[in-house]
Amino acid sequence: MNPTYQLDRSQQRITVEGVTYTAAEIGRISVPESTPEMEHFVEELKSFLQEWFDPSPTLTVHTSGSTGIPKALCVRKAQMMQSAQMTCRFLGLRAGDSALLCMPLRYIAGKMVVVRALVAQLDLCLAVPSGHPLARIAHTPTFAAMVPLQIYNSIQRKEEQIKLMGIKQLLIGGGAIDTALEQAIHTLPGAIYSTYGMTETLSHIALRRLNGKQASPHYTPLEGVHVALSEAGTLCIEAPLVCDQPLITNDIARLYPDGSFTILGRKDNVINTGGIKIQIEEVEQALKSILSQPFAITSLPDPKLGERIVLLYTGKALAPEKLDILPKYQRPKAILYTQEIPLTETGKINRPACRSLAAQLQ
């Protein structure tokens, strides 16, 4: 029989494998399997709960490292709770609802699932972080947060797809959502959102509806969040509940009169080739219609152009003329073949690693 850990509400405490944590508000913690991997995941949860309930008002979180070396940040627990409350209010989560924890607890996304369970008194179902988080859970959760790869994999298997369809509130973050995946989930019955945020904002500060009649290409800031553009055209975030100071991001954005916004790409994902600045994400988006295997756009130094555009591709030999769908100035000058595209632990393209790989393969 799989264990369930029940909160003693009279004394506001929770016991996980014999260890009691005071002041917790999680309803239940359900562990659907007993494996070495799950035991390790439970240990990670216990460690986080110990850190959460110790007297310190702060804890340390780490960035994913998708654009550089991962860094440690000291954040306030009170602000994490404010972030969780903003999300729970927006999604209408309440005591007795259930949340799926299928993200690594090393990063802010996983930690915030637990904090949302704390502030909203949600039941918490554990699934070892993997590409198929729904495979072994017995009951479909009310709420889940996943990365695009987990969603894609879940759609491929009928049993997992049925569970995915039963999730009422689903957040997708940690990486770009391509057009094909967005189309595949458009008719699912639950409310599905793409998230925008970062470790510095304690996960997301804006959501974009992906399915149903309310689907939109724009991100809508959560309550209490205001956005503007810097002189460089990057998004500025003012979210006093979760950030002490306004945050200037590296994300090039476009604002709309209703306060919503779209992200065009990252300022540091620009290739300057022959004096023309190319946004990497724009090229990748255009190529998704013709490339069926994982790929990434990166660059290499060029004595004439300064930088030349390079395509890293995991598929079979690609006819160069297929790239003619791109304007001439956006076309890769080289196609380099690799077995896999470097990713961070959270599933984002690891841009520095891609540049290093291209240098090795040329």
Predicted regions and their residues:
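Conserved pre-ATP/AMP-binding loop-to-beta segment of ANL
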Residues: 44-62, 95-98
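Conserved AMP-binding A3 loop
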Residues: 57-85, 92-94
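AMP-binding/adenylate-forming
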Residues: 76-82, 98-153
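Gly/Ser/Thr-rich phosphate-binding loop
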Residues: 157-213
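AMP-binding/adenylate-forming core of the ANL superfamily
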Residues: 226-248, 252-254, 312-314
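Conserved C-terminal "lid"/linker of ANL adenylate-forming enzymes
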Residues: 271, 310-314, 322-362
